[in-house]
């Protein structure tokens, strides 16, 4: 496979320092130690490796500054974005404002979403996933 794809669904928990261990299969798709986390469009956190983030950023930066909706999307995505490092044990620190945005307390579900991964509060994800199955 030439293309990187983030796949799967994994249950994890935050530790007392708000770190989560990234699933091995997610880490295998990442070539570097630095990631970008940002607010998702649903109540979740988007996670990107450098290449995926650069592609996502380019899409938004190509939108003319005169495009009101494009400007709003750009502000939404970039203002919440933070660089985080993967430590030697495969953990990342979940920034407080992103944790709060996604209503994450302890138990999370990490899902692959193709070109990025997402971190959800486990109960929120379970409810959302049930709705996906019904529709």
Give the label of every model feature segment.
Residues 1-12, 16-19, 25-84, 88-89, ...:
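Flexible "stalk/tail and boundary" regions
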């Amino acid at each position: 496979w030439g293309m990187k794809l983030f796949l799967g669904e994994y249950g994890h928990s935050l530790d007392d320092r708000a770190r989560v261990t990234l699933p091995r299969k997610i880490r295998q798709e990442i070539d570097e130690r630095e990631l970008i986390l940002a607010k998702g469009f649903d109540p979740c956190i988007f996670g990107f490796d450098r290449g995926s983030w650069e592609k996502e950023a380019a899409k938004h930066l190509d939108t003319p500054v005169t495009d009101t909706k494009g400007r709003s999307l750009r502000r939404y995505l970039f203002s919440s974005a933070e660089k985080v490092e993967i430590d030697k044990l495969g953990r990342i620190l979940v920034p407080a404002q992103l944790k709060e945005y996604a209503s994450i307390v302890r138990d999370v579900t990490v899902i692959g979403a193709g070109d990025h991964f997402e971190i959800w509060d486990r109960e929120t994800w379970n409810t959302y996933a049930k709705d996906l199955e019904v529709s």
